Amino acid sequence: MAHPHLLAERISRLSSALEKGLYERSHAIRLCLLAALSGESVFLLGPPGIAKSLIARRLKFAFQRARAFEYLMTRFSTPEEVFGPLSIQALKDEGRYERLTTGYLPEAEIVFLDEIWKAGPAILNTLLTAINERHFRNGAFEEKIPMRLLVAASNELPEADSSLEALYDRMLIRLWLDKVQDKANFRSMLVNQQDESDNPVPASLQVSDEEYQQWQKDIGAISLPDPIFELIFTLRQQLDNLPNAPYVSDRRWKKAIRLLQASAFFSGRDAVAPIDLILLKDCLWYDAQSLNLMQQQLEILMTGHAWQQQAMLTRLGGIVQRRLQLQQQQSDKTAFTVIKEGGMFSRRPHYTLPPEASASTLTLLLQKPLKLHDMEVIHITFDRSALELWLTKGGEIRGKLNGIGFAQTLNMEVDNAQHLVVRDISLQGTRLALPGAAEDSMPAEIKQQLETLENDWRQQHTRFSEQQHCLFIHSDWLGRIEASLQDVGEQIRQAQQC
């Protein structure tokens, strides 16, 4: 078996070759290739003339030896046109019911069925067995069919509660395509002279039958780690609790997990990673409403939980709360405390300064800076005698803001804990403390917790960086996930700097 990274590079080059001359169809080609390499089915929804059939034809060139079959369904289509005509000779000579399948669906590796919902019950029933079991009943015999990829297409969805739902449920990947939108791409498409029937894939990139069979075994060996299962189960629970969520059968979940294993395998990994889960948005929707819903739910999962973003923010919130508690405790210890001396007949308590405040002028620090008289203030200088008079009799108190200029009127009070509190115009308050009493450094407990959290964040970011190289995921998703992780990292850094 090729080295995992060499295999991933080969599949990437194979996809690039298949995409040549197809504009704004890279994602569709890549998912169809993933489906072909893992033996799954694809449904393409979109208006006529947007290269749905060409996508299917291209996939034939991914393999060294692959036969293709395509058919446009109508209400009058018969099983003979899809599965092959009856052998008149076998019926006449031996009385045996047998179809001549050469050149028809039972002998094709790549199958494209356009306007699939117009097929009649006889075709649909046989097709269900072919998709489910990869077998075709030809007369008295069960024949194994080599189909690796079924691409079904239509410009409409099947009607709800119709007989078509069983077939629709078998189509694991569902892609909603539209016309070419970008101006430059539209021009390139108009002037492109490439023959659509040409093989754009070098022989060295094409997949042999032996490789394909071996890869099916290797895909099954890709592990599903417990944290990834928890994410999947969380998504399943979220969908079950939403009133308008699509019904997702257990069969579809199981097939979707195999697709995630294939994504991991062809990305050079030995286990499913969170990045692979984005593929579920193309597997679990049913109609336009559920398509948007799946997009929203996957975004919540990817930007909030897949790399522990929300869990880290919750931890950060707890650390910040603990820090505030410690700061409050420290504030209580370091705040400037006056002595209460209420007289026997005094209705108003009065206070005196503590012995350590013996200087003629006192400079007290604000435990938290405030804006006073249009100035950012970090300390206030008081005349000791004026402060003593205010503590005894009340009235107006003045102090020099940051120790400069004239003394300014202050909104100051003594709180219940006998601490001096100064307030700004919005009544935001902070306690005052003697210089040297305030502890500005971050508590060791908080510093350690923030360092641990930052290390955990770095590990998650490294995991994302290592796993983000996935051919089958659109780059827009990578940008949103990176932004969510950077936001968490920035909040941690801000907390460390406070």
From Swiss-Prot:
Pfam families: AAA_lid_8, ATPase_RavA_C, bpMoxR, LARA_dom. Its EC number is 3.6.1.-. Signal peptide: none annotated. One of its GO terms (cellular component) is cytoplasm. GO terms for molecular function: ATP binding; ATP hydrolysis activity. It is an enzyme of class 3 (hydrolase). Keywords: ATP-binding, Chaperone, Cytoplasm, Hydrolase, Nucleotide-binding. It comes from the Bacteria. InterPro entries: AAA+_ATPase (IPR003593), ATPase_RavA (IPR023671), ATPase_RavA_C (IPR022547), MoxR (IPR045427), P-loop_NTPase (IPR027417), RavA-like_AAA_lid (IPR041538), RavA_ATPases (IPR050513), RavA_LARA_dom (IPR046898). SMART domains: AAA. ATPase activity is stimulated by ViaA. It catalyses: ATP + H2O = ADP + phosphate + H(+). Disulfide bonds: none annotated. It is found in: Cytoplasm. ADP binds at residues 23, 49-54, 196. Belongs to the RavA family. Homohexamer. Interacts with ViaA. PANTHER family: ATPASE RAVA (PTHR32204:SF0). Component of the RavA-ViaA chaperone complex, which may act on the membrane to optimize the function of some of the respiratory chains. RavA functions as an ATPase. NCBIfam families: PRK13531.1. This is Regulatory ATPase RavA. It comes from Salmonella schwarzengrund (strain CVM19633).
